[in-house]
From Swiss-Prot:
Pfam families: DmpG_comm (PF07836), HMGL-like (PF00682)
The protein, known as: 4-hydroxy-2-oxovalerate aldolase 3
Keyword field contains Lipid biosynthesis: no
UniProt site (Transition state stabilizer): 15
Family statement drawn from the similarity comment of this UniProt entry: Belongs to the 4-hydroxy-2-oxovalerate aldolase family.
Protein encoded by which gene: hsaF
Higher taxonomy: Bacteria, Bacillati, Actinomycetota, Actinomycetes, Mycobacteriales
């Protein structure tokens, strides 16, 4: 990390935003967004299908342009920013990591459910052997206690992960809950690995939670310009940078340039604004994986049921990423109850 940074920001608009865009990014959009973010000084830009390498499928939605092609475009466009990719073991495979690196990506971000860090061990080993920077995602971090989350972080760090993220996939964590988890990871990992935080806006706390994470010791923070992400979106990078400027935390990102990028480049690529509407609010309240939003809206329309109620029941069942197909079962259940 450069000495001019207190916090390294990763922009996930071109990965988490893919959920909101139903994975329909074009090469031209990726080129424009990467160029604008790079110009603003964003140090890391994540590019893949919303569900990571190999996510383009019937279950998750097909990409308009193959993700490896988009990674290559991003690498060719960025002058200073590093290009990162996300992969979920079992959805993506180890060969996908090799191809992404061959296309110029330099940061490998590996995500697992917060209780399943052990499935990432071989993938971290491969990434480190190939000289990639490594980041670990412990998703749905609200669903287990801080001390248990720290033990899972230790598994990732011992496998070669250089920064373990507390990932609030549902946007369900509230301030002190973020601080408690970040502090637990910082205490557990010490100098062995950094700690990061990835938030969502489903309770309107993306920026506030990110600042809480910074104050608790996080060194890497995710966000999406214009909140371009799943659910109500991620912590908006432009707002986070502005707050950091006001409290004296260095990000290396030009506030005015990132505000221009949000308004003039990212917004035109969005199908609509990411809103804190009823459905997104229910996800944060019930603790539902943020990428479920578009799937729930589709099944609610198909079966004539309430998408909000669908999401609340998904939360009660503690569904996790990869179980989107169970929304159909819940929709049918709701439909039967109405007969």
């Amino acid at each position: 990390m450069r000495s001019s940074w207190d916090i390294r920001v990763t922009d996930t608009s071109l990965r988490d935003g893919s959920h909101h865009k139903r994975h329909q990014f074009t090469g031209e959009e990726v080129r424009a967004i990467v160029g604008a973010l790079d110009h603003a000084g964003v140090p890391v830009i994540e590019v893949t299908h919303g569900d990571g390498l190999g996510g383009s499928s019937f279950n998750y939605g097909f990409s308009k342009v193959p993700e490896q092609e988009l990674i290559s475009i991003a690498v060719d466009t960025a002058k200073n920013a590093k290009i990162a990719f996300l992969m979920l073991p079992g959805l993506g495979i180890k060969d996908d990591i090799i191809v992404a690196q061959d296309n110029g990506a330099s940061i490998c971000r590996i995500a697992t459910h917060c209780t399943e860090a052990d499935v990432s061990i071989q993938h971290f080993g491969l990434a480190r052997d190939r000289g990639l920077e490594t980041v670990g995602f412990l998703m749905m971090a609200h669903s287990i206690a801080p001390e248990k989350l720290a033990k899972q972080a230790r598994i990732m760090a011992d496998a070669g992960c250089q920064c373990v993220y507390v990932v609030d996939s549902a946007g369900a964590l509230v301030l002190e809950q973020v601080s408690d988890r970040v502090e637990a990871l910082v205490q557990e990992l010490g100098s062995d690995a950094q700690v990061g935080f990835h938030g969502h806006e489903n309770l309107g706390l993306g920026v506030a939670n990110s600042i809480a994470a910074v104050r608790a010791g996080a060194k890497q923070i995710d966000g999406s310009t214009r909140r371009f992400g799943a659910g109500a979106g991620n912590a908006p990078v432009e707002a986070f940078v502005g707050v950091c400027d006001k409290i004296g935390v260095k990000t290396g990102i030009d506030f005015f340039a990132i505000a221009d990028a949000a308004e003039d480049v990212v917004r035109p690529a969005m199908p609509a604004e990411c809103l804190l509407d009823r459905q997104a609010l229910m996800m944060g309240y019930a603790g539902v994986y943020s990428s479920f939003l578009k799937h729930a809206e589709r099944q609610a329309e198909r079966y004539g049921v309430s998408s909000a109620e669908l999401l609340v029941r998904a939360g009660k069942r503690k569904l996790v990423g990869g179980q989107e197909d169970q929304l159909i079962d819940i929709a049918l259940e709701l439909q039967r109850e109405r007969l």
